[in-house]
Design a protein with these regions (language model features):
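Residue-level detector of well-ordered alpha-helical segments, enriched
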Residues: 317, 330, 343-351, 372, ...
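Strongly charged, low-complexity linkers/loops
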Residues: 364-378, 387-457
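Amphipathic alpha-helical core segments of compact helical bundles
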Residues: 18, 195, 230, 348, ...
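Short, amphipathic C-terminal "tail helix"
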Residues: 445-477
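Basic, nucleic-acid-interacting segments
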Residues: 1-298, 315, 337-340, 353
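Core structural elements
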Residues: 187-200, 308-333, 344-361, 397-402
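M16/insulysin-pitrilysin zinc metalloprotease superfamily fold
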Residues: 341-347, 355-367, 375-380, 384
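Amphipathic alpha-helical segments within well-ordered protein domains
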Residues: 304-308, 332-336, 356, 374-381, ...
Length: 477
């Protein structure tokens, strides 16, 4: 019987924290600064005698994240020196946390969390100057939070990649909702590393795992994890398990494959020891954790549940709102005005399809006022305008936010519901389309819809389709 292969995934996610200053000095924390080496000082440049001072806001942000994922906040924490030599670390060591992280445990999006700790970011190496490599120290010393998950074993590559990607997406949302980080992956404010191994025994994890470094998009996470699982699986199938070694690998976006970078270091290689220049952290004394827990904002999963229960809208629509706090706030105000569940659902459909469709083609369009948008939905429900006309009116509203009723009146778009007004138009179309009439009378029910379309066109879109169908059937009997 053929072996079954079980992938095991663990994630490490780094996120630059949203603070005014760096982790251990008063230099500005500004990821948008384009001029190199301006936000630097003796502390983040490791000048002799320059001593670090802990950024309390950074610790507060990590605690908030820990509370949001139901982690345990440590009574005691401390910073350690992680010793290694690399040009982007001027001190020869990185200030990090090893034995005593700020947060232990927790759970999010089907994955258990091992720990969340705080460290300083490294400088930014520039390798685009030919034979020279340049270093920008603006990022050096920026507060960097690292989340580490437990390794999780999965039944298939599809489940593994989906779970890993969903976790990263959900964690980014948590950071946004808490205001802890901008977590912009394109700018390197959130970086994902995936530890991957494959085994033929579901209960035994392979010791030879690889770490895929610095994945800077969710698509890269999905593609890199999938590729690496499949690469390892093929080696195992071919009896080449010795070629699977514990190493660090990169992801080549162009070639869509991982590549070997270096042998994977162990914690002993870094010779961690407590930083003698920094005090121990007594977190339960320094922070009111109960109050911080109470003051957490509504988080994504709670918001999903509320939207399902209160509005009954589609899951796809809910995810649109979860990922756009401004849009969701606008929708909630519209829903509060409309109140009727059917109207709220219709409003959501127009927002997530028609309004966002318009915005996709023109980023500069205006968001209609809550009152005007609610009025548009009411006009549809009152049969004063058709759904097609509503789309046209909305396209005008995003330009000047005029009243939809005013637009409908000025453009003669109000729906004609008066049967006596519609009958002459219907009679005209019946006379001009004898073939469709014969087809309908011959049993082809769909033939009536071509007549309906012509009648609505003849009325410049103002004829009520339901009334048109009713009258047509009566007049063709």
């Amino acid at each position: 019987m053929a072996n079954k292969y079980y992938p095991t995934i663990g994630l490490e996610i780094h996120a630059e924290l949203k603070t005014q200053t760096k982790m251990f000095c008063a230099c500005k924390n500004d990821s948008d600064e384009e001029k190199p080496n301006v936000n630097i000082c003796p502390v983040c440049m490791a000048h002799p005698g320059a001593l670090p001072v802990i950024n309390k806001k950074a610790i507060e942000n990590v605690i908030k994240v820990g509370l949001a994922v139901n982690g345990t906040i440590a009574d005691f924490s401390e910073f350690d020196r992680k010793n290694y030599f690399y040009p982007d670390i001027p001190k020869g060591y990185q200030i990090s946390q090893y034995k005593f992280p700020i947060v232990s445990g927790g759970h999010l999006a089907d994955m258990d969390i091992t720990r969340i700790h705080l460290e300083e970011d490294t400088a930014n190496n520039k390798h685009d100057r030919g034979k020279y490599a340049l270093i920008d120290f603006n990022r050096s010393g920026v507060p960097l939070m690292e989340l580490v998950t437990e390794p999780h074993t999965f039944e298939s590559v599809e489940v593994a990649t989906k779970t890993a990607t969903n976790f990263a997406k959900e964690f980014q949302l948590i950071l946004w909702y808490l205001g802890a980080s901008e977590a912009n992956m394109e700018k390197g404010e959130m970086r994902v590393e995936a530890n991957v191994s494959v085994s033929t025994d579901k209960n035994t994890k392979s010791k030879n795992y690889v770490e895929i470094k610095n994945l800077n998009s969710f698509r890269s996470v999905e593609k890199a994890v999938k590729y690496e699982i499949e690469r390892m699986t093929e080696l195992l199938k071919d009896g080449k398990e010795k070629e699977i070694v514990r190493e660090t690998r990169g992801w080549d976006e162009g070639k869509q494959k991982t590549f070997s970078q270096r042998k994977k270091e162990g914690s002993a290689d870094y010779r961690y020891f407590p930083d003698p220049d920094l005090p121990k952290l007594k977190l339960h004394e320094a922070f009111d954790l109960g109050k911080m827990k109470e003051e957490l904002p509504e988080l994504p999963e709670a918001k999903r549940t509320r939207y399902r229960n209160c509005f009954g809208i589609k899951n796809e629509d809910i995810e649109v709102y979860i990922n756009d706090k401004v849009l969701s706030a606008w929708f909630e105000e519209v829903a509060d005005l409309l109140k009727v569940p059917e109207k709220v659902k219709l409003a959501s459909n127009y927002i997530t399809t028609d309004y966002l469709g318009l915005k996709k083609t023109n980023l500069d369009i205006r968001c209609p006022s809550v009152e005007n948008f609610a009025e548009l939905i009411n006009l549809i429900f009152e049969n004063k305008i058709s759904s097609r006309t509503a789309k046209d009116i909305l396209a005008m509203m995003v330009k000047n936010d005029a009243s939809p009723m005013k637009i409908a009146q000025e453009k003669n778009l109000l729906q004609k519901n008066d049967e006596e007004t519609l009958k002459p138009i219907i009679e005209k179309i019946i006379k001009e389309n004898s073939e469709a009439v014969v087809s309908y009378k011959g049993g082809k029910e769909n033939a009536i819809m071509s007549l309906v379309g012509k009648i609505i066109k003849e009325s410049n879109g103002s004829a009520n389709p339901q009334i048109v169908i009713k009258l047509l059937k009566e007049m063709l009997e």
